[in-house]
Curated annotation (Swiss-Prot):
GO function terms (MF aspect): metal ion binding; ubiquinol-cytochrome-c reductase activity
Any one Gene Ontology BP term: mitochondrial electron transport, ubiquinol to cytochrome c
Cell location: Mitochondrion inner membrane
Record-linked InterPro entries: Cyt_b/b6_C, Cyt_b/b6_C_sf, Cyt_b/b6_N, Cytb/b6-like_sf, Cytochrome_b, Cytochrome_b_C_euk/bac, Cytochrome_b_N_euk/bac, Di-haem_cyt_TM
Domain of life: Eukaryota
Gene from which this protein is expressed: MT-CYB
Name the UniProt record assigns to this protein: Cytochrome b
Length: 379
């Protein structure tokens, strides 16, 4: 009798994806972040579901319902802070996952890569709408500022913003629809993740060398299942240290003040994981230009397969490209820092220089260095 694992219509899909999957023998810990993102998504959906059981999406009661969750619901504080800090862990894993893809040339699987970029957009949209739900000061003003950016779109801008708001300002209708979208999007993300994996399993995983690994494959289980479990334990450890020791470390104290349309906080800023994009947005004095730069700062990831000029896939054997990659990482850290600073000298000019450098490295410097490295191969 054949093993049910290999014959059952449903179980065999799981088998081909997680058990008998041939995987390269040399993939490093940088390949753990895919599974960690899956765990983050599961944690977020589960904690979010339990929060939704007690949350009310009404401007009058939203803030107090979150307070009620933290004070009166059994372990409500734990669920709430796991959800809030789970989002931070999600983005840490996302950035590392994307960085791994850039460093090792994984973007040459362009269907997998492009679905990944769409996933990044979807997760960012979900996180933004989730931040609005507690209806604190930063929730309200963050929603006002970011949705207002759409008014920069010529001709239809103002109408579009009022349509999204469901009125003439961010109000009850906005909060209700943001809750609805925040609830549904993670399930759309889950479906996209399955498509992401489907395309990945068409080609198999990349590996640190960037070379074809067909001649040296090992089964996913037990080798990478145990490796993933170690990664998951470390992720949960870091998350729980954050949740139990300093749950508000990454939050904004302004969000503990109920939303008040009549008083603007001195510094409106998003959560830390959007600060790099926010800095790029602010570095351009023109509204439409800023919005375009904001969108392009993420959309530019889709250009990497086209901009790949090197004869080698991975950066493992390309020291000049490696150096430029780490300068890009440092530039993103700089942008993140600038995004959280007030709009004044010297932060404005630092932000503008960092924004120019960001686009220059990706569009000009990395491809040019790749071509130079191709020449070096002939020496």
């Amino acid at each position: 009798m054949t093993n049910i694992r290999k014959t059952h219509p449903l179980i065999k899909i799981i088998n081909h994806s997680f058990i008998d999957l041939p995987a390269p023998s040399n993939i490093s810990a940088w390949w753990n972040f895919g599974s960690l993102l899956g765990i983050c998504l599961i944690i977020q959906i589960l904690t979010g579901l339990f929060l939704a059981m007690h949350y009310t999406s009404d401007t009058m009661t939203a803030f107090s319902s979150v307070t009620h969750i933290c004070r009166d619901v059994n372990y409500g504080w734990l669920i709430r802070y796991m959800h809030a800090n789970g989002a931070s862990m999600f983005f840490i894993c996302l950035f590392l996952h994307v960085g791994r893809g850039l460093y090792y040339g994984s973007y040459t699987y362009f269907e997998t890569w492009n679905i990944g970029v769409i996933l990044l957009f979807a997760v960012m949209a979900t996180a933004f709408m989730g931040y609005v739900l507690p209806w604190g000061q930063m929730s309200f003003w963050g929603a006002t500022v970011i949705t207002n950016l759409l008014s920069a779109i010529p001709y239809i801008g103002t109408t579009l913003v009022e349509w999204i708001w469901g009125g003439f300002s961010v109000d009850k209708a906005t909060l209700t629809r943001f809750f609805a979208f925040h609830f549904i999007l993670p399930f759309i993300i889950t479906a996209l993740v399955m498509v992401h994996l489907l395309f990945l399993h068409e080609t198999g995983s990349n590996n640190p060398s960037g070379l074809i690994s067909d001649s040296d494959k090992i089964p996913f289980h037990p080798y990478y299942t145990i490796k993933d479990i170690l990664g998951i334990l470390l992720l949960i450890l870091v998350l729980m240290i954050l949740v139990l020791f300093s749950p508000d470390l990454l939050g904004d104290p302004d969000n503990y003040t109920p939303a008040n349309p009549l008083s603007t906080p001195p510094h409106i800023k998003p959560e830390w994981y959007f600060l790099f994009a926010y800095a790029i947005l602010r570095s351009i004095p023109n509204k439409l230009g800023g919005v375009l730069a904001l969108v392009l700062s993420i959309l530019i990831l889709m250009l990497f397969p086209i901009l790949h000029m090197s004869k080698q896939r991975s950066m493992m054997f390309r020291p000049l490209s490696q150096c430029m990659f780490w300068i890009l990482v440092a530039d993103l850290f700089t942008l993140t820092w600038i995004g959280g600073q007030p709009v004044e000298y010297p932060f404005i000019i630092i932000g503008q220089l960092a924004s120019i450098l960001y686009f220059m490295i990706i569009l000009l410097i990395l491809p040019a260095i790749s071509l130079f490295e191709n020449k070096l191969l002939k020496w």
